């Protein structure tokens, strides 16, 4: 599966409450595979994934960050890796890797 195909699957199967921008980038801090930012004033979620990673790791980082994006309506949960995030991660994983 290509990275862009995974983004399209997630957009259709696990849509976010805001517009989303997904970028493969070389501009992340060292040892950071991905990040998810929320700009409420623009109603925009920006997901960045490290371009230098192998494809399978890029997909895992995308799934991880998309799960954070699913919690955009819950500010106390958005940056956590708690039970709510775990459920979102599982849903995203199943969308990208259906059994």
Give the ranges of each region predicted by the language model:
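Catalytic zinc-binding patch centered on the HExxH motif and its immediate surroundings
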Residues: 17, 23-44
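Post-HExxH zinc-binding segment in Zn-dependent metallohydrolases
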Residues: 74-99
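Active-site recognition of the HExxH zinc-binding catalytic motif
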Residues: 60-72
């Amino acid at each position: 599966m290509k990275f862009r195909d995974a983004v399209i699957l997630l957009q259709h199967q696990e849509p976010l409450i805001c517009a989303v921008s997904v970028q493969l980038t070389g501009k992340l801090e060292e040892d950071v595979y991905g990040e998810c930012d929320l700009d409420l004033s623009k109603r925009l979620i920006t997901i960045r994934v490290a371009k230098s990673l192998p494809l399978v790791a890029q997909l895992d980082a995308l799934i991880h960050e998309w799960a954070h994006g699913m919690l955009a309506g819950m500010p106390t949960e958005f940056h956590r890796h708690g039970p709510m995030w775990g459920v979102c991660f599982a849903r995203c994983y199943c969308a990208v890797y259906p059994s």
